Amino acid sequence: MLGISLFIRPMLGFMLLSTACSSAADDHAAADQPLTTAQTKPEKSGKKGKKGSHKKDKAEAQANGLRRVGKLTDGILESSGLCAAPEAGTYFTFGDDGQQPTVWRVDGTGQQVDQFTLGAPNHDWESLSRDPSGNYYMGDCGNNGSDRQNLAILRFRPAAPGQVGKINFKYPDQTEFPPNKKERNFDCEASLWHDGQVYLFTKDRATQNTCKVYAVPDQPGNYTAKAVTKLTIPGEVTDATLAPDGHRLVLLARQELFVLDGNSWADILKATPRHISLQGAGQTEGAAFKDQNTLLITTEQGDVYELDL
């Protein structure tokens, strides 16, 4: 069983009212293939950029309950995140680490519908979430070497992508850039909006065992992120998404994911994560709920999968 240890007082147990980008539209009915969960401890994940290090037969991914439903349109390179778009049945995706500041809108099979340019550079975009008012929050906080000092969340509306508000932040417990290799847990590829805050989930490059959770306000400004909790996650988290009813958090990692259930945000952050293997899927980077029980997953190689939870 995977434990969770809080390093600050837990947040009050309020009911979730979030629509983290995870809250996706109902574009297809859930398919009927069963889900198979892993029965053993997950393997350690590889470092980003080693695309071939986890290449497996697609049949193995299908055995784990994944259904390959499509391929991202050519030209959409190294999809790094996924988020429901305002238009039903469509999703936003984007590249990372110095690519053009382009956001693509695709359908549930990965085919491009349209695209727009965001009015801010792509230092290392890694995640995208939204609030109930239609604001989107792009996490420009990829930090492979734990040495960046220009971390930001980019707030925008798709109808006016040239107008970007910057939520600049720093971590309260980082004093060296970079820190010692054993302390490099300041890379962040997963974030989501909830109740006026943008929550950040780190990717532990040091021990691949601890996901630190921070929060910053959802308004533009300069902030020191608030340390919220530490989650024992034996993998490197690549995306985060919240179910439409707000009672289930999914943390995606490399060829695996972790599910945390609860009746409140505080309960979710104290829940024991349930591990699901995605072995054979490739470098899984983006996740968004298609409906309450179906997850859409994209890989850096461009594959699009569905998974019943």
PLM region descriptions:
Residues 22-24, 28-309:
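Sequence/structural signature of beta-propeller domains
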Residues 2-26:
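Sec-dependent N-terminal signal peptides
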